[in-house]
């Protein structure tokens, strides 16, 4: 993530490694994630970044005590996230499980990626979404294996 002031400097640095550089718009709103099991969305989650780190990197994701993953209270956002994630899952011909990640700004929601083999550690988002949906870890594993 680069500020406008440091953009040219960062672009020059990136071009030291490759002549081709990917530049993405930064969204300043909340980040969301929706885990899908057999094409059906589980409880969508909002990711509240560690305010000290300011960016959801490896450290913030796995080691920070300040990063939070919470249920979304706004039902209209939950509905939109579920609808979009189901379309993405189907469009990409996913089968058993996946996780769709979103960024937002104002009313805009943007899909940033789909994880066709999402993380599955004790701190991962997929098992947490399943737990909030009433599916315990062992049952989740069984459901995934049964569908393969």
What are these regions (language model features)?
Residues 10, 85, 126:
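Aromatic/hydrophobic pocket-lining residues that form π-stacking "cages" and hydrophobic walls in ligand
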Residues 30, 120, 135:
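Gly/Ser/Thr-rich helix-start
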Residues 30-31, 105-106, 146-147:
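Short secondary-structure capping/turn micro-motifs that flank functional sites
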Residues 46-98, 129-148:
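Active-site "cap" helix and flanking loop/linker of ATP-utilizing ligase/carboxylase catalytic domains
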Residues 4-80, 109-110:
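Phosphate-binding site of ATP-dependent enzymes
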Residues 25, 34, 89-122, 130:
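Conserved metal-phosphate-binding beta-hairpin within the catalytic cores
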